[in-house]
């Protein structure tokens, strides 16, 4: 169980670094926000998942 908790914590730390490169690339494209907002929102969705997962796993580790 500890490995799962450590993996979830790592994911919750590592995944937010992806938009650091992705979001400026979307805004630098010729179409800008109008064509790239789906990319930004789909990139933000996986960032939400590890947060409750870490909470659930943390409550089960004593």
Curated annotation (Swiss-Prot):
PANTHER family: PHOTOSYSTEM II REACTION CENTER PROTEIN Z (PTHR34971:SF2). GO terms for biological process: photosynthesis; photosystem II stabilization. Belongs to the PsbZ family. The gene is psbZ. This is Photosystem II reaction center protein Z. The chain crosses the membrane at residues 8-28, 41-61. It is found in: Plastid, Chloroplast thylakoid membrane. One of its GO terms (cellular component) is chloroplast thylakoid membrane.
């Amino acid at each position: 169980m500890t490995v799962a908790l450590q993996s979830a914590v790592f994911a919750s730390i590592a995944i937010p670094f992806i938009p650091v490169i992705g979001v400026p690339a979307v805004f630098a494209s010729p179409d800008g926000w109008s064509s790239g907002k789906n990319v930004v929102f789909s990139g933000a969705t996986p960032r939400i998942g590890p947060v409750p997962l870490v909470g659930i796993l943390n409550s089960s580790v004593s």
